Amino acid sequence: MNGKEGPGGFRKRKHDTFPHNQRREGKDASLSSPVMLAFKSFQQELDARHDKYERLVKLSRDITVESKRTIFLLHRITSAPDMEEILTESESKLDGVRQKILQVAQELSGEDMHQFHRAVTTGLQEYVEAVSFQHFIKTRSLISMEEINKQLTFTAEDSGKESKTPPAEGQEKQLVTWRLKLTPVDYLLGVADLTGELMRMCINSVGNGDIDTPFEVSQFLRQVYDGFSFIGNTGPYEVSKKLYTLKQSLAKVENACYALKVRGSEIPKHMLADVFSVKTDMIDQEESIS
């Protein structure tokens, strides 16, 4: 039997000839090497970043759900007897949404917003849609991005957390602030989604005998469409994609205004909504065929 072969004729591996203690010391030394320590820190940093991303995704979902509920509430204005009561309730709901956005701002404090933008963009777009819908109902105008950004500036009083360490004598109390700035793309996509809600509001208002709202909405949508037309295909892909949906909403509202102007006296008010819904379905079918 060869001296290099162990019992049973199996050839010994080279590392089997090393003493056991020597192998353990080599393993411990490799774990404490600068390279291993560097990769260990990279692992911890990536794990922390992934955990933060998941928390932001969850907050974005909550913001989306609460914003949609606010939009559904605002649609009741066309049939509700007390408009102010619904506006007050919608404001309290939007305050709750802003508390969620405050948590997002706290998570992103000291971080690069663009690294986590994909996690929160859906919720921010839905919030823009809800707050701009409420603003249009109140003022018949479009809320600016600067106004929304002002609403997304928070202090320690907004979060309900006061600083536990009192300021020293002669030092003024520093006010902790958190800001979350919308990107222009988030704002534009939220406004583009708003046009679909305004189209539904137009049809619902006609069904309740409100003849003025469709013409106000039509004029507003034309201005929004003209603004988006200046961007055209030069802007982000998502914006140019929304432009087609915006054009559809404008066509449906203009069709409703045309029917009101030309045939409004022929059709009873309680049947107007049914006529418009049939015509919008016909428009959808024609566009799908083309």
Swiss-Prot record:
There is a cross-link at K279 (Glycyl lysine isopeptide (Lys-Gly) (interchain with G-Cter in SUMO2)). The keyword Ubl conjugation applies. GO terms for cellular component: cytoplasm; endoribonuclease complex; Golgi apparatus; nucleoplasm; perinuclear region of cytoplasm. It is found in: Cytoplasm, Perinuclear region; Golgi apparatus; Nucleus. One of its GO terms (biological process) is siRNA processing. Residues 73-208 are annotated as: Interaction with C1D. One of its GO terms (molecular function) is metal ion binding. Detected in heart, brain, lung, liver, kidney and testis. Keywords: Cytoplasm, Developmental protein, Differentiation, DNA-binding, Golgi apparatus, Isopeptide bond, Magnesium, Metal-binding, Nucleus, Spermatogenesis, Ubl conjugation. Residues 16-28 have a biased composition (Basic and acidic residues). Sumoylated with SUMO1. Residues 1-31 are annotated as: Disordered. InterPro entries: Translin_C, Translin_fam, Translin_N, Translin_sf. It comes from the Eukaryota. Its main location: cytoplasm. Mg(2+) binds at E129, E197. Ring-shaped heterooctamer of six TSN and two TSNAX subunits. Interacts with GOLGA3, TSNAXIP1, SUN1 and AKAP9. Interacts with the homodimeric form of C1D following gamma-radiation. Interacts with TSN and C1D in a mutually exclusive manner. Belongs to the translin family. Acts in combination with TSN as an endonuclease involved in the activation of the RNA-induced silencing complex (RISC). Possible role in spermatogenesis. This is Translin-associated protein X. It comes from Mus musculus (Mouse). The gene is Tsnax.
